[in-house]
Amino acid sequence: MLVITPTAENVTESPNARMTGLAAPSRGSTELSTWTVAMEAGRSGPEHSVSREQVWTVTSGVLEVTCGGRTEKIAAGQTLVLPPDVLRRVHAPQKAEAHVAMRADGVVRVPGTEETRELPWAR
């Protein structure tokens, strides 16, 4: 058994959100990564795809998620399953937080580029 306590070194700030890494291979998990996402009202992440399925559970506020051309509002207490390799964008119409889980080997791709990018908070 392993207990993980978030620290400042596990936090990644972007212009759109704050990601706090929890379970990940760098912190003792072998298969899964989990993290929290905190977004201020009006912020949106970039359109991108992820190579692995992700499970988002909104813990406060509301998120609007567009995936594969369909938009859903996800409120606190609801869970959204995002399929792999489908374009998505996450928007916070109000301040929101979510807990995310994914296989640890997932990578991100942005439309119009061939390169993939690792998620540092999930490694």
Q: How would you name each of these model-derived features?
A:
Residues M1-E31, P111-R123:
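A short, N-terminal "cap"/entry segment at the start of jelly-roll beta-barrel domains
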Residues G28, K73-A76, P84-R109:
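Ligand-binding loop in jelly-roll beta-barrel domains
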Residues S33-V50:
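Conserved short histidine dyad/triad with adjacent acidic residue
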Residues S49-A76:
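A short beta-strand-loop-beta hairpin characteristic of the jelly-roll/cupin
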